[in-house]
Amino acid sequence: MKFSTDRIITTHAGSLPRPPELLKLIRAKVAGQPHDEKGLEAEITSSIEQCVKRQADIGLDVISDGEFSKPSFLSYIVERLDGVTPTDEPFGQPWKGSREHNQWSEYYAWEAQVGIALAPVTATKRVVCSGPVKYKGHDKVKADIARFKAALGKVKVEEAFLPAISPTQVEFWIRNQHYKSERDYIFALADALHDEYKAITDSGLLLQIDDPRLVTQYVMDASMSIADCRKWAEVRVEALNHALRDIPEDKIRYHTCYSIDMGPRTNDMEAKDIVDIILKIKAIAYSFEGANPRHEHEWKVWNAAKLPQHKVLIPGVITHSTVLVEHPELVCDRILRYAQGLGRERVIAGADCGFGTFAGMQTIHPTVAWAKLEALVEGARMASRQLWGRAAA
């Protein structure tokens, strides 16, 4: 993976706003309505090509396919696994009963009435693990890779990455009804997902592991203490590292965040309580929230953490948690805090979270999301001028 050797390079968290026509076709497929599968595939290909070009045009260095082939960053995995069964049971509201919902129930009731009008395009029924888990998505991940690399062949960027879901997140999404223990289940998922991870890195692309649940378990399960969550997280990190076996560390970036909730967020697990466990994950780079009001101050925690010398951080310097477009000078200041603590070569400028995590659920309008990414690029150029004493390329 490339580092910021002569300037601060830029990236983001993976998902980007999907075009309206693509959303329409994805919505029809997820709803089980008649749709043109060939037309959908063609639209995915065209949309990825446009997305890749736009990322390159605004100056992003390390880019993704926008996750345009997936209804969401996690539900896509259901059709890539054997041993899972959809049910008629509603998935429900995962935030209900969480620490956040319990403290701010009046706010969330109000938000439900006046908040986001667009429902996410994703499965609303519970999926269960009903048998041995095996990966069967080889053709689908090959198609993702082929589409992305075809689009990359038409632009000039530093590197490219494909996101893939973590075993821990799948464990949350697909309820275990087959394995005797949580440990057996999470390691079975790790074995299955290894195939997807290795296919991505074998193609020459970087792999990004998407793992919000590692830090959201604390807020989601009000019965667990910090100590409980740390013990729980240790097992999940062990399983993830098992899934990443025989994959070169320098091909892996790890992303965690506190979800797309735009609520008060006063119950988020603090970085100081989990950073040492995160750094046990086999990855060359760690992407995390660093630009929103609940976590911006944690640059001090990350700078003080014992990050191995050969690894880098990808702090969020723009955020999905507000529609305000960050001023490039603010982006620059955020980058400088990390660079002054870790060294300029060990910082890559990133985003807190994706801007299209669930197709159709847009807390940030596409025009605003792209403006934020432009501010990210300009802020990185400003930081580069200060850190290297010359204009960035």
Describe the residue ranges of each PLM region.
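Domain-level signal for soluble alpha/beta catalytic cores
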Residues: 1-393
